Amino acid sequence: MEQRLAERLSAAQLPEANDIAWAGVWLESCGYTGLMFLREALADEQKSLPLARDALGIDLQNVSCAFLAPAIMREVSANGRAFLRNVRHGLFLLPFTVRENMAIGCPIDPAFAVGGERHKNPYAEKLALAAANGLDIDDALWSAVTLT
């Protein structure tokens, strides 16, 4: 599933397609609406944004984190904790923060912080169950995100 989604996103010339696909499937595996958010984001005209810190943190200008999450994580890893504002689909940061053991504020808020250390992975059990049992994804949603 992840590989097929990554191939479709790559065909649509989306940078970081593998990471986007991984995060979408990760979210679905944990019971979140990753693919629904990805479908919404794919309809957006703007899919990238140069990340620049200002006195308040980083203004994401409502560009979807489905596309920005990998770059945000690189920026925070290099420069430390950041306050994000005008966040859209912030839940897409969750898989990356868990993988990197990085703290995250409430990713459904329009503004929150990312950075610091996480000491526990609360999603390991859900991911193991999804790996063992597979995922049940709505056919229409799957078609929408795989661009078929």
What is the meaning of each model-derived region?
Residues 35-113:
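A glycine-rich, acidic short-motif signal
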Residues 10, 37, 41-44, 58, ...:
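Acidic, glycine/proline-rich low-complexity segments that act as flexible tails and inter-domain linkers
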Residues 15-16, 108:
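Residue-level detector of short coil/turn "hinge" positions at structural boundaries
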Residues 1, 13, 64-66, 134, ...:
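General structural signal for secondary-structure boundaries
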Residues 84-85, 96-148:
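Glycine-rich, aromatic-bearing surface loops/beta-hairpins
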